[in-house]
């Protein structure tokens, strides 16, 4: 019975890998990581007010960052955003 469970687990994990692997190769990934410049703006979880810049798909836009959490589509200056997302 123990070998059957192990084989079932291996089969399940193999199928899961085959199903999710194409997502890792999608257009939103670059060199194995999610393309930062395609992420939506995310204020984060705190209530601070830091002016930051993000790329909204077509232009560089200001938003208020709360100081904690959020995602990596957040830059301290427009110039820093342009340097990272120039090819987006």
Swiss-Prot record:
Disulfide feature: 37-85
Positions marked as site (Reactive bond for trypsin): 47-48
Annotated Pfam families: Kunitz_BPTI
Domain BPTI/Kunitz inhibitor: 37-85
Main location class: secreted
Keywords: Disulfide bond, Protease inhibitor, Secreted, Serine protease inhibitor, Signal
Propeptide: 28-33
Residues making up the signal peptide according to the UniProt record: 1-27
Annotated compartments: Secreted
Any single Gene Ontology cellular-component annotation: extracellular region
Gene3D superfamilies: Pancreatic trypsin inhibitor Kunitz domain (4.10.410.10)
One GO BP annotation of this record: envenomation resulting in negative regulation of voltage-gated potassium channel activity in another organism
Membrane spanning residue stretches: none
SUPFAM superfamilies with a match to the protein in the record: BPTI-like (SSF57362)
GO molecular function: potassium channel regulator activity; serine-type endopeptidase inhibitor activity; toxin activity
UniProt tissue specificity: Expressed by the venom gland.
Function: Serine protease inhibitor that inhibits trypsin at a molar ratio of 1:1.
Protein family according to the UniProt entry: Belongs to the venom Kunitz-type family. 01 (intermediate) subfamily.
PANTHER family in UniProt: KUNITZ-TYPE PROTEASE INHIBITOR 2 (PTHR47247:SF1)
Name of this chain's protein: Kunitz-type U15-theraphotoxin-Hhn1o
Organism annotation: Cyriopagopus hainanus
């Amino acid at each position: 019975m123990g070998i059957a469970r192990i084989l079932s687990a291996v089969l399940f994990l193999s199928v899961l890998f085959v199903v999710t692997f194409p997502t890792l190769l999608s257009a939103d990934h670059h060199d194995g990581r999610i393309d930062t410049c395609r992420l939506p703006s995310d204020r984060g979880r705190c209530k601070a007010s830091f002016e930051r810049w993000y790329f909204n798909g077509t232009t560089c836009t200001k938003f208020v960052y709360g100081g904690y959490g959020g995602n990596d589509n957040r830059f301290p200056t427009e110039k820093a955003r342009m340097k990272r997302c120039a090819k987006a």
